[in-house]
């Protein structure tokens, strides 16, 4: 039994989500191969070869794969994937984009966002915004799976010495083109990789008030997130959204400020190791999942906390 893991990367560096996905592959059992598809990805392939538990790295270096356009990447993965028992990818924007197409090309059902491996054909995944866990069994010859990375502890990034093999695949399908992207520059950690996250909700009242969270986050070395209510209100951009329809995080410390705790938000952060809630409404649902709660006006509490840090 061999498992193909699709590497998450930016053509320059291997993303941490790949390490969690390899951990899921190890739980399944079998030889683990990693596919690095992109442009000028030698450094990524080198990093993937060092990952604990990986026995082979497949490298598809082609301009057609540079931006992970699903119309180009999916046929490549499907062509390679038919020789494996499992194809795994992190449940990231890219993974959620191309892997359903891979499943369709292989004529199998996809299993989405697993958080536990029961056996090589049986997996657990959250449903109902994380309020229930479904056990799913697949009889497909090739099991196509996205992995919720917060469900698996990352394997070591060093210690492996996998063989590296060049592969080729279908060229540019010509069905879509990459136009451009705007990258937000920040000295703060990336939201899904941060060990500490400070998030604000509707209680922040406006975007300008997020500056008190930024001040606290900078002292803690934390990333800053937001609830959907704050994003929908235009307080902050949607790349800061934590929740079922945003980013899934599981930091060592999650500080929820002015967040009521709708189930959609809880689905994105309830696996955090320690949850601290600050809200003036003592009946707010967020207190039901918080390890520590402070019933207070956030505009008094957060500046005091920032001064004390």
Curated annotation (Swiss-Prot):
Please give the superkingdom of this protein's source. Answer: Bacteria
GO biological process terms, alphabetically, are: fatty acid beta-oxidation using acyl-CoA dehydrogenase
Cofactor info, note text: Binds 1 FAD per dimer.
Q: Which PROSITE patterns match?
A: ETF_ALPHA (PS00696)
Q: Which InterPro entries match?
A: DHS-like_NAD/FAD-binding_dom, ETF_a/b_N, ETF_a/FixB, ETF_alpha_N, ETF_asu_C, ETF_asu_C_CS, Rossmann-like_a/b/a_fold
> Transport: is it a keyword of this entry?
yes
CDD domains reported in the protein's UniProt record = ETF_alpha
Q: Which cofactor does it need?
A: FAD
Q: Which Gene3D superfamilies match?
A: HUPs, TPP-binding domain
Q: Which UniProt keywords apply?
A: Electron transport, FAD, Flavoprotein, Transport
Task: Report if keyword Lyase is assigned.
Answer: no
Q: How does it assemble?
A: Heterodimer of an alpha and a beta subunit.
Family, similarity comment: Belongs to the ETF alpha-subunit/FixB family.
Instruction: Report what the protein is called.
Output: Electron transfer flavoprotein subunit alpha
Q: Which organism is it from?
A: Pseudomonas aeruginosa (strain ATCC 15692 / DSM 22644 / CIP 104116 / JCM 14847 / LMG 12228 / 1C / PRS 101 / PAO1)
User: Which gene does this sequence derive from?
Assistant: etfA
């Amino acid at each position: 039994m061999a498992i193909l893991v699709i590497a998450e990367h930016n053509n320059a560096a291997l993303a941490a989500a790949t390490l969690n996905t390899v951990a899921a592959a190890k739980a399944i059992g079998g030889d683990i191969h990693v596919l690095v598809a992109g442009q000028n990805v030698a450094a990524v392939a080198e990093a993937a070869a060092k990952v604990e538990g990986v026995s082979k790295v497949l490298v598809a270096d082609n301009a057609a794969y540079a931006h992970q356009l699903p119309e180009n990447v999916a046929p490549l993965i499907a062509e390679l994937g038919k020789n494996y028992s499992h194809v795994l990818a992190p449940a990231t924007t890219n993974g959620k984009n191309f892997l359903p197409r891979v499943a369709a090309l292989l004529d199998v059902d996809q299993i989405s966002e697993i958080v536990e491996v029961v056996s090589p054909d049986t997996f657990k995944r959250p449903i109902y915004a994380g309020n229930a866990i479904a056990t799913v069994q697949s009889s497909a010859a090739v099991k196509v799976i996205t992995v919720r990375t917060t469900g698996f502890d990352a394997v070591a990034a060093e210690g492996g010495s996998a063989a590296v093999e060049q592969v080729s695949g279908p060229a540019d399908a010509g069905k879509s083109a990459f136009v451009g992207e705007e990258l937000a520059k920040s000295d703060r950690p990336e939201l899904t990789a941060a060990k500490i996250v400070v998030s604000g909700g509707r209680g922040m009242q406006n975007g300008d008030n997020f500056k008190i969270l930024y001040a606290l986050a900078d002292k803690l070395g934390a990333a800053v997130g937001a609830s959907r209510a704050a994003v929908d209100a235009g307080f902050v951009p949607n790349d800061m959204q934590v929740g079922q329809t945003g980013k899934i995080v599981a930091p060592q410390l999650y500080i929820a400020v002015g967040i009521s705790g709708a189930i959609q938000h809880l689905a994105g952060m309830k696996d955090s190791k320690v949850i601290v809630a600050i809200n003036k409404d003592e009946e707010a649902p967020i207190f039901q999942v918080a390890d520590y709660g402070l019933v207070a006006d956030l505009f008094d509490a957060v500046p005091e906390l920032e001064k004390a840090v």
